[in-house]
Amino acid sequence: MKFIAAVLLVALLCPKDSTSLASRLSGLLGGDGILGGSGLLGGLGKIPLGGRLLGGRPDDVLREDDVLGEVGGRPDDVLGEVGGRPDDVLGEVGGRPDDGLGELGGGPNRLFGGSRLFGGVEKVVAGIPLPNVADVAGGLPVALPVSVRRRRALGVVGGLPVPKLPGVAGGLPVPKLPVPLPVNL
């Protein structure tokens, strides 16, 4: 209990910038990732504390770009961020911005043959090329249910479209949803 109280006190007192101790506590307490990360699926969710968000900025749950919470002290775009930079659509892996549907191992994915989304040759999962695979949830390739433009409005959780949410308010995390099987492998 003393440790939890100390963590909450530090989160309230630290500055709002993404390098603050409070922002790092979000990764420490909930994990830093797209599925199961702090403020995302199965993580801490948003914890309003006197106008502050544990490990991030104030709980501005009505922001247009705020769908499933914050990670690392910055507002998320759709499904949060990994590596300290804002995500493009479904977050990033390896500390670089994603190329439309996220990255694996720090390199941009190539999907369907071109320069961005629908612009590449293949998606690489754990070193294995998987053509015509949309995104990866929990290490598993999942089908792309809607277009990326619609996903910016809807958001995608575990490969399933979900209504746009005003963040994860009141400290309630978003439950995990079933992950569909990959297609066109």
UniProtKB/Swiss-Prot annotation:
The keyword Signal applies. It comes from the Eukaryota. Expressed by the mandibular venom gland. GO terms for molecular function: toxin activity. One of its GO terms (biological process) is regulation of blood pressure. Residues 1-20 form the signal peptide. The keyword Signal applies. This is Celestoxin. It comes from Caribicus warreni.
